[in-house]
C-alpha cells in the first residue's frame, strides 16, 4: 500500500510539473508576440472596438477602419452621420414610411 501512494504522488508531481512548464511556455510565447507587436485578428478587433467606444457616434466611419467590409447599397444611400437624428426612429425604414 505504501508503494502505491508513492507512485501516485510521484505521478501527481510529474503532472503538475508538466502543466507548469506548459503554462510558462505559453506565457512567454504571448509575451514574445506582444514584444514583436503582433496582434491576432480578434485582438485587433477588440482594440479597434475599444477605440470606437471612446469616440462620439457621429465621428466614426467604419469604412476607414474596415476597408474590407463592403457596404450594401441601402447603407451607402443613408444620410451622413452629421445630419443623423436620434429622435427620428423610423428614418430610413421603408416599411414604416409606407413605400411598399
From Swiss-Prot:
Write the protein's name. Answer: Suppressor of silencing 2b
What InterPro entries does its record include? Answer: Cucumo_2B
Matching entries from Gene3D superfamilies are given as:
1.20.5.3800
Task: Summarize the protein's role.
Answer: Multifunctional protein that plays two independent roles: viral suppressor of host RNAi (VSR) and viral inducer of host attractiveness to insect vectors (VIA). Acts as a suppressor of RNA-mediated gene silencing, also known as post-transcriptional gene silencing (PTGS), a mechanism of plant viral defense that limits the accumulation of viral RNAs. May directly interfere with mobile silencing signaling. Also inhibits signal transduction by the phytohormone jasmonate, making the infected plant more attractive to aphids, which are the second host to play a role as a dissemination vector.
Subunit field text: Homotetramer. Interacts with host AGO1; this interaction blocks AGO1 cleavage activity to attenuate RNA silencing and thus counter host defense. Interacts with host JAZ.
Q: Which GO terms describe its cellular component?
A: host cell nucleus
One GO-annotated biological process of the protein? symbiont-mediated suppression of host innate immune response
Keywords tagged on the record: Host nucleus, Host-virus interaction, Inhibition of host innate immune response by virus, Suppressor of RNA silencing, Viral immunoevasion
Where does motif Nuclear localization signal map? 22-27
Q: Which organism is it from?
A: Cucumber mosaic virus (strain Q)
Q: Which family does it belong to?
A: Belongs to the cucumovirus/ilarvirus protein 2b family.
Q: Where in the cell is it found?
A: Host nucleus
Amino acid at each position: 500500500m505504501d508503494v502505491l501512494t508513492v507512485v501516485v504522488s510521484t505521478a501527481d508531481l510529474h503532472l503538475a510539473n508538466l502543466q507548469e512548464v506548459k503554462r510558462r511556455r505559453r506565457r512567454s510565447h504571448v509575451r514574445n508576440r506582444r514584444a514583436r507587436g503582433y496582434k491576432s485578428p480578434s485582438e485587433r478587433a477588440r482594440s479597434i472596438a475599444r477605440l470606437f467606444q471612446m469616440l462620439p457616434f457621429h465621428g466614426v466611419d467604419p469604412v476607414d477602419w474596415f476597408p474590407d467590409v463592403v457596404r450594401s447599397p441601402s447603407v451607402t444611400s443613408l444620410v451622413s452621420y452629421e445630419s443623423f437624428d436620434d429622435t427620428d426612429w423610423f428614418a430610413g425604414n421603408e416599411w414604416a414610411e409606407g413605400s411598399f
